Amino acid sequence: MSQEGSAKRADFKYKIGKIKHTPPVLKDVRSGLEFIELEKRDDEKVYGVTKFLGNYKEEKKLGQGTFGEVYRGVHLATQRQVAMKKILVKTENDLFPITAQREITILKRLNHRNVVQLIEMVYDYPPAQNGAAYGQDSSQASASADTMKSFYMILPYMVADLSGILHNPRVTLEMADIKNMMLQILEGINYIHCKKFMHRDIKTANILLDHKGILKIADFGLARNYYGAPPNLKYPGGAGTDAKYTSVVVTRWYRAPELVLGDKNYTTAVDIWGIGCVFAEFFEKRPILQGKTDIDQGHVIFKLMGTPSDSDWQLARYLPGAELTRTSYEPTYKERFGKYLTEKGLDLLSTLLSLDPYKRLTAMAAMQHPFFSEDPLPKLQLTLPCEESHETDIARYGQEMQKTVSNLPPAAPSGHAVEQSQTQQQSSRHHQSQPYQSLPPQKSSQPHPQQIPEAAPVQQPSQQPPQEPSAHQQQYSSRGPQQHRTTPAPTSLPPKPKPAPPGARYNREAPPQNKPVKPLTRHLGAQYQHNNYGNYYNHWQGGERYYETYNDGYPHADRYSDDTHYNGYGYRSRGYQRYDMRREGESRYNQRPYAPQQGAAYRPNRRDTYKLVDRTGQPYPPERVPNPELHPSPAPRPKRTLTNTTQLSSHSSAATGSTAASGSAVSNSSEPVRRSSTASLDNSESGNILQQKPPPPVANPLEARIYGRDEVQSNHPGGRLYPRSTPDSKNSEGAAPSEASTDPTKRNIVDYY
């Protein structure tokens, strides 16, 4: 049998196929990794990526990335423009760059409107293999045989980046535009930091802008994850950990001071420093900290923000480059940017460019800075001229500016009307865009004779209403468009929009409105409360409420608030404790009992009874005495008489005998003796006897059941008013088995529940 089984196993293995040749295990010299070199096939295919040929086409180079070039391309199937980031693999044995692997992995894990999106990856076959497919002859294919392999990261095409926008002379940014851009940058970097990543290359060239005015943070070639807690309103991400990273990151002009001093235990605050540099670059249109070397970069930083003291930055003395902190520079950022920013703007700039990374603002705290809530408020949507502005266009902008300066017409004589109007327009624009740094010069009372030419007097606008056009003017206007016709001002303007009403709904900072609050409508039930469509609880389709399992009235509260298992639906849906087998494997052995834990309102002196309050029964009003025919009361208790022992000697023997008989009756009774100090003496023939009157009927039938029980009721198990089973009942739990109990067809179904 064993030989037959082994033969079957060998036959089965042969049918699957045997490995004829095992490739040798090789070892990479640089990385020390072991790998297997597989033989190439003619139909080579890289799985997980798209083939470049036949799907995409390069058009124009846009810029240079960290480890590759960026091109503008076209997706041939949809004719949509895309940005193609080329990742170069130089030789056949070269590994895929680790920075590109990080960038692809991080972009796949990010999804935010202010972070660039990775569409797909594309693999370009080397032209040496597919020269004919590229439309090349053999000579062209052999000439380009040594070209490098390349992967492409396909990204959405952006019309501009921030460096091109700032250097474009035809684009002017207002303060509302700058605030909008800053908020978008802070939202994007806050999302990246909360996802436990550091960008480590924040600069204007890596902040892109699409045609809708949405900024997107790009170029994650130097990004990586960090260790520690994510940022909050006070501390940056990764604070308080011993993790060490490389300090040679970030472009030099945007490098934080802790990186300049050689700190390897940095946090997400290095990205906030770059955002502060970008914020200041909005106003000077050029990088604000242009150091020539790494040491010079530290001097440039301290010249702007001042040399840090021990109180400003306590840990600076322990960094490798602490010699730079021995300089003595005073901060000059207020003199440099005070002409552009208000006090709140300067405060935001100084906290973004704080030398101590732990005193630097986090992104979520910077978004709540009061600079963004003062006038002018940030624009809701960014609208810029539709012109492509990339980093590669900066040189072209400089050439255009030189050409325009050299080709300017000769200047007009001083005091000319055209020059005067142009200077007035420029001054008005300047005063609208920037706050006054000094008062404008006062106008002289006597005008200069050259300022008012005689040939072209200035016409003042007339205050008369516009006249009706003549027939000649109407005939002229009907022939064609009148180029220099001015539209008269409208006689009636549209009404101004009403301001938002005060209150917390429209203005959160408004004082509270101390008005009486209207109480909520009492829920009277479905047949009393209605909406516009009919039933209060449903929509217009009808009585769906009456067929649902549970409606809006559920879950309701427990009446006495003492049942821990009460779930609001009138039944105990789960008598056992829920547990997660994957997380707590031992919970199945730690089940709590089904018996509920009684609350504070439960009185356990008698079982299965709930007491509302501890009070004696109140008598019925005379008009509400229950009808004995409808509500038969139990048999009245016999009157119990007690002997007054102080007066036995002064009575007759008959009275003594009667009292003795009554005393024996009392002694044989099973009920406790109750004396009443307020009982009146009975002056009958039998002597002075204290008569015990029965208690008055109680008002609440439920309390009558609880307090007014006799011996028969209290002797039943559980203290129930009615016994669960009697010999006469059909279920006969406490009696001998009968035909009804043995026959399952005659058994009451209620007994099982």
From Swiss-Prot:
Keywords: ATP-binding, Kinase, Nucleotide-binding, Nucleus, Serine/threonine-protein kinase, Transferase. Its main location: nucleus. GO terms for biological process: positive regulation of transcription elongation by RNA polymerase II; transcription elongation by RNA polymerase II. Residues 491-502, 619-636 have a biased composition (Pro residues). Residues 56-372 form the Protein kinase domain. PANTHER family: CELL DIVISION PROTEIN KINASE, CYCLIN-DEPENDENT KINASE 9. Serine/threonine-protein kinase involved in transcription regulation. Phosphorylates the UBC2/RAD6 ubiquitin-conjugating enzyme (E2), leading to monoubiquitination of histone H2B and the silencing of telomeric-associated genes. Also required for histone H3 methylation. Necessary for the recovery from pheromone-induced growth arrest in the cell cycle G1 phase. This is Serine/threonine-protein kinase BUR1.
